[in-house]
Design a protein with these regions (language model features):
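Catalytic nucleophile-loop/oxyanion-hole region of alpha/beta-hydrolase
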Residues: 82-84, 89, 104-138
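A fold-wide structural signal in alpha/beta-hydrolase
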Residues: 69, 95-102, 166
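Short beta-strand element of the alpha/beta-hydrolase
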Residues: 67-76
Length: 180
């Protein structure tokens, strides 16, 4: 009984210490490139979304930051984003480790591979711009499935100020070659 009470109090204190997420527009003055998608964003089952044309970054600041931050790129085959199970659902765990966590809602490529990559790079820039505010020293990028492909591409095809300090890849797509 004491163990259940202790675990319940721990869960409640963790929930109370969690900070509210902050959502930022990735490109408040308009994105530098376009994916050509003009149809409205669609909310699909299980909090998946498609037709993303206005990317955002949702930040979950750690209550007791350790200096690390992770930008998560949800997967979805570059046609939709699995925002919960490959994004928002992991925020509490990362925050409990002292890691500021951010979920990137990136634009679909729609034949323009540079579009999601520019969103990933901009997310890293934004995290660094707010480094003092969120007590960040290192910014990493993480992704699952197609998001893992995007994360690894962002980590290897960077420009000044967009190179992540580390990467975490969950079952990433490593080839777009469908012949194998």
């Amino acid at each position: 009984m004491k163990r259940i009470l202790l675990m319940s109090l721990l869960a409640i204190s963790t929930a109370l210490s969690a900070q509210k997420p902050v959502e930022l527009e990735l490109w408040p003055d308009g994105a530098p490139n376009s994916n050509g998608i003009t149809t409205p964003e669609q909310k699909l089952e299980n909090n998946r979304i498609s037709n993303v044309s206005e990317p955002t970054l949702t930040i979950y600041p750690a209550a007791k930051p350790n200096g690390l931050a992770v930008v998560a790129c949800p997967g979805g085959g570059y046609i939709r984003l699995a925002m919960n199970h490959e994004g928002h659902d992991m925020a509490d765990w990362f925050n409990a480790q002292g890691i500021t966590y951010a979920v990137l809602k990136y634009r679909m490529p729609n034949g323009h591979h540079d579009v999601p990559l520019s969103d990933a790079h901009q997310a890293i820039r934004l995290m660094r711009e707010h480094a003092n505010e969120w007590h960040i020293q290192k910014v990493g990028i993480m992704g699952a499935s197609a998001g893992g492909h995007l994360a690894s591409t962002a980590a290897t095809h960077y420009t000044a100020g967009t190179r992540p300090d580390f990467q975490i890849l969950f079952y990433p797509v490593i080839s777009m070659d469908l012949s194998n």
